[in-house]
Amino acid sequence: MRKNGRGPLDLRPILLEPRVSKHAEGSCLVRFGDTHVLCTASVDEKVPPHVYGTGAGWVTAEYGMLPRSTHERMQREAARGKQTGRTLEIQRLVGRALRAAVDLRAIGPRTVTLDCDVIQADGGTRTAAITGAYVALVQAVRSIQKRKQLAHDPVKRSVAAVSVGIVAGEVHLDLDYDEDSTAEVDMNVVATGEGALVEVQGTAEGKPFARAELDRMLDAALAGLSRLKELQEAALRTP
């Protein structure tokens, strides 16, 4: 039995609280157990140079951890003068994941930026960020629609993410920090609401894992992602 009485294939308690920022076009406070991430979506009526002139829009992301989101205080990356490789990797992952949800041409020549700030970290910050950022993105798109600036809805599919791994020889869904630290295999799975894979990041620690174990982990992840889709839909129905 895991923490909080969870079974191997149970998610942590999940909360998606939308509209937590009065300034951002979209926002969501997402909680995966003791991992809490604030996701905001901002709309800018311009696009980066590589998109300029195409008529399409862009969706991008930034990610960061507050200094006391972990057991010991971390120095802010701004104070160090550079972002870590981990930060750059995660924010690129979040951006790729969210672009899979939308038709960039239908967004028009504007940029939606998802800012994902980790308030408290207990494993799975990138998967929580993607799941919450999708909710914020949809709200931002709706704000553009209210201004009657979109001919078609650019959101084509939902996207969520969850971690999965092998701990003590058993497949575990939605790993917390302690489980992640001792896992023989650690994997992050991003998928659409229909179950199509967007990105899979998997690493073995110490020894390789079999194809059959990979299949079991993917099955567990997709089952968890189906539940996350339901929670996203419920959050977006909240007035």
Curated annotation (Swiss-Prot):
Q: Which residues bind phosphate?
A: 86, 124-126
Q: Which EC number(s) are documented for this chain?
A: 2.7.7.56
Q: What class of enzyme is it?
A: transferase
Q: List the SUPFAM superfamilies hit by this protein, alphabetically.
A: Ribonuclease PH domain 2-like, Ribosomal protein S5 domain 2-like
Q: Which reaction does it catalyse?
A: tRNA(n+1) + phosphate = tRNA(n) + a ribonucleoside 5'-diphosphate
Question: GO molecular function: any one?
Answer: tRNA nucleotidyltransferase activity
Database matches in Pfam families: RNase_PH, RNase_PH_C
Cystine crosslinks: none
Q: What processes does the entry annotate via GO biological process terms? A: rRNA catabolic process; rRNA processing; tRNA processing
Q: Which UniProt keywords apply?
A: Nucleotidyltransferase, RNA-binding, rRNA processing, Transferase, tRNA processing, tRNA-binding
Q: Which Gene3D superfamilies match?
A: GHMP Kinase, N-terminal domain
Assembly information from the UniProt record: Homohexameric ring arranged as a trimer of dimers.
Q: Which family does it belong to?
A: Belongs to the RNase PH family.
Provide the function of this protein. Phosphorolytic 3'-5' exoribonuclease that plays an important role in tRNA 3'-end maturation. Removes nucleotide residues following the 3'-CCA terminus of tRNAs; can also add nucleotides to the ends of RNA molecules by using nucleoside diphosphates as substrates, but this may not be physiologically important. Probably plays a role in initiation of 16S rRNA degradation (leading to ribosome degradation) during starvation.
The protein's name is Ribonuclease PH
What organism does the record attribute this protein to?
Answer: Anaeromyxobacter dehalogenans (strain 2CP-C)
Instruction: Print the organism lineage.
Output: Bacteria, Pseudomonadati, Myxococcota, Myxococcia, Myxococcales
